Amino acid sequence: MEKAVHLSTKNGPKVPGEPTKTGTSMVDTAASAVQSFAPINQIHQHLCAFHFYAYDMTRQVEAHHFCGHINEDMRQCLIYDGPDANARLIGLEYIVTEKLFMTLPDDEKKLWHTHEWEVKGGFLFMPGVPEAIQRQDLEKVAKTYGKVYHFWQVDLGHQLPIGLPNIMMAVTRDGQLYPEMIKETEKQFGVSIDKERESRAYMKGPDHGIHPLANGGGKGLKLELREVDIKPVESVPRVFV
């Protein structure tokens, strides 16, 4: 199967539509002056990592996470295909501590992936942040689990978000990512995956080890759509029509 890789916004498909008009920008500016964006204002960090489709490891995407803590045990991230202002919102990820992960039903656990090798392998980093500062948080991230969905298949050149959401996974060992993808990201952000790895060798993963049901339980996962009967509101005899 031919590999599909998406590295950054600059390499992505052009979104169809007219340029934003002055009138629209003026309305946006006026609204932003009086409205609160409290949820977005909770975003406190930018993490760059790589995801692959849970049913097709040959399809790999550079994923930029903009995250905020809900509490000490959970954070939530908006995922874009680049760090630029025109980046596309392609997905979201929930990150929980091992403590919360262990409370999940077994059928749910397979939807979550580990972050241990992402962190220890040097594949997850905070662009522009000194490594010494990064390590203070990445020590915690290495022990966590994440659940991530992508809604926009930019690696296939889709100009709009088409199709079903896709469950994504993260790297768990060497040899899974394309070398050219790693090199391009290193060049773009001025980082060295090998040096990052050396400085994080002391870090530990989940205290109880990687759960055997995590990471898809070692199997591929793919969402499928099927038609079902819709339960209507009692006062409405028909649904939609």
UniProtKB/Swiss-Prot annotation:
Keyword match Ligase: no
GO CC terms, sorted: lipid droplet
Keyword field contains ATP-binding: no
Taxonomic superkingdom: Eukaryota
Region feature (Disordered): 1-24
Expressing tissues: Expressed in seeds. Not detected in stems or mature leaves.
Subcellular location: Lipid droplet
Stretch forming the signal peptide: none
Consequence of gene loss (knockout): Irregularly expanded oil-containing structures, 40% reduction of triacylglycerols (TAG) content in seeds and 98% decreased seed germination rate.
Single biological process term from Gene Ontology: lipid storage
Record's keyword terms, sorted: Lipid droplet
Main location group: other
Membership in a protein family: Belongs to the OBAP family.
Family matches, as PANTHER family: OIL BODY-ASSOCIATED PROTEIN 1A (PTHR31360:SF10), PTHR31360
Protein name in UniProt: Oil body-associated protein 1A
Gene: OBAP1A
